[in-house]
């Protein structure tokens, strides 16, 4: 059986806790994807994969389900710093071609979210595709205790 995603949705979240692992769990909870066994995959959006809302995507998943995603994650405990995690997506004009998702994370700077979009767009262009549209989602937070930012493109098979 081929595991080709039919749909994708985008989420982001921030978590804070004295323990780094718990801050990650809280970031997943803030994003709404803490109830799944998340498996990281690389950057391909299959041809015909439809973008759906977070709410629609979550309705199609079950607690404990193995779920594939492209995730950006960044954690810090350096108080006062501002961190981020972004995923950017680029979709081709030609519906028979694949799109791309790019992860980008670190300490916040102006243009960070746009950089994630540009990365995905550049990967799409290198396959000779024209870009129909781009999208990005970002989690951003000021560090207090351990702080984790996550952004993810979550696939529905």
Curated annotation (Swiss-Prot):
Keywords: Decarboxylase, Lyase, Pyruvate. InterPro entries: Pyr-dep_his/arg-deCO2ase, Pyr-dep_his/arg-deCO2ase_sand, Pyruvoyl-dep_arg_deCO2ase. Coiled coil: none annotated. GO terms for biological process: arginine catabolic process. The record marks 42-43 as: Cleavage (non-hydrolytic). It catalyses: L-arginine + H(+) = agmatine + CO2. Its cofactor is pyruvate. GO terms for molecular function: arginine decarboxylase activity. Its EC number is 4.1.1.19. Binds 1 pyruvoyl group covalently per subunit. SUPFAM superfamilies: Pyruvoyl-dependent histidine and arginine decarboxylases. It holds the Pfam family PvlArgDC. The modification Pyruvic acid (Ser) is found at residue 43. Belongs to the PdaD family. PANTHER family: PYRUVOYL-DEPENDENT ARGININE DECARBOXYLASE. This is Pyruvoyl-dependent arginine decarboxylase 2. It comes from Archaeoglobus fulgidus (strain ATCC 49558 / DSM 4304 / JCM 9628 / NBRC 100126 / VC-16). The lineage of its organism: Archaea, Methanobacteriati, Methanobacteriota, Archaeoglobi, Archaeoglobales.
């Amino acid at each position: 059986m081929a595991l080709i995603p039919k749909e994708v949705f985008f989420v982001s979240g921030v978590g804070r806790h004295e323990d780094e692992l718990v801050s990650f769990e809280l970031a997943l909870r803030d994003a709404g994807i803490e109830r799944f066994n998340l498996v990281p995959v690389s950057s391909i959006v299959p041809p015909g994969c439809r973008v759906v809302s977070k709410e629609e995507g979550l309705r199609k998943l079950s607690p404990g389900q193995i779920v594939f995603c492209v995730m950006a994650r960044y954690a810090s405990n350096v108080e006062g710093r501002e961190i981020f995690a972004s995923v950017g997506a680029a979709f081709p004009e030609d519906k028979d071609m694949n799109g791309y998702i790019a992860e980008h994370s670190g300490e916040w700077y102006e243009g960070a979210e746009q950089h994630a979009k540009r990365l995905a767009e550049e990967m799409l262009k290198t396959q000779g595709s024209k870009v129909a549209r781009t999208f990005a989602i970002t989690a951003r937070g000021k560090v207090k205790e351990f702080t984790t930012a996550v952004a993810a493109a979550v696939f529905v098979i």
